[in-house]
């Protein structure tokens, strides 16, 4: 059912120039960055087919009219992806979606937590208990509950866990402020001029 519902939506994704001209429709996504980037994404799709995943929507070789020399690729959709496949293990950085099937909530959680990457994840449910369990135990830096892409606003921290993290701090939010802040700590103590005290050489306490 998921694959049947997703296929027409992926096929309908519009790709073209990142900045449309007057009269042109807005695009869902633009071209990739370089020819090498396009080759990498294309090779991932080919690898997925060779490994046995079911390619439901193939975005390879798609070129918008008037932009045939651009680094374009259409949306692609795989079904029956398994955790031992390259397209599951590695980040593709292209418009390629893979459906991985799990038999239970616990199995799905295990798949996420055993993956080396942990940027963002989401759960869709009407069960508040399952949502709390997911948010508490899932090993990812950004969690969405009935939100498909859990990228927070700039006043929240943005970043992942595990191999999706590149620093002890994330970007945006309080971590972004800390990154650009040089801390200074000043400790002061003013004696009471009406109280005579002997000299003290220990750490002062309040």
Put a short name on every predicted segment.
Residues 14-15, 21, 45, 63-206:
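Conserved C-terminal structural/oligomerization subdomain of aldehyde/semialdehyde dehydrogenase
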Residues 22-28:
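Short linear capping/connector segments at secondary-structure termini
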Residues 31-41:
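Short beta-strand to alpha-helix junction loop
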Residues 55-65:
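Cytochrome P450 fold signature focused on the C-terminal beta-domain
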């Amino acid at each position: 059912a998921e694959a049947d519902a997703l296929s027409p939506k992926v096929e309908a994704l519009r790709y073209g120039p990142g900045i449309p001209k007057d009269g042109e429709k807005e695009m869902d996504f633009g071209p990739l960055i370089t020819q090498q980037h396009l080759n990498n994404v294309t090779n991932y799709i080919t690898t997925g087919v060779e490994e046995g995943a079911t390619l439901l929507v193939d975005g390879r070789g798609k070129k918008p009219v008037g932009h045939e020399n651009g680094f374009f690729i259409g949306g692609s959709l795989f079904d029956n992806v398994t955790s031992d496949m390259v397209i599951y293990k590695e980040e593709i950085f292209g418009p390629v979606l893979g459906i991985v099937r799990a038999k239970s909530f616990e199995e799905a959680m295990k798949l996420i937590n055993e993956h080396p990457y942990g940027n963002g994840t989401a759960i869709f449910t009407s069960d508040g208990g399952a949502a709390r369990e997911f948010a508490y135990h899932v090993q990812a830096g950004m969690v969405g509950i009935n939100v498909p892409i859990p990228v927070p606003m700039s006043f929240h921290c943005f970043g992942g866990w595990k191999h999706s993290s590149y620093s002890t701090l994330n970007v945006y939010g309080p971590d972004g402020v800390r990154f650009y802040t040089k801390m200074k700590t000043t400790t002061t103590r003013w004696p009471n001029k009406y109280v005579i005290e002997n000299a003290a050489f220990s750490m002062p306490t309040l």
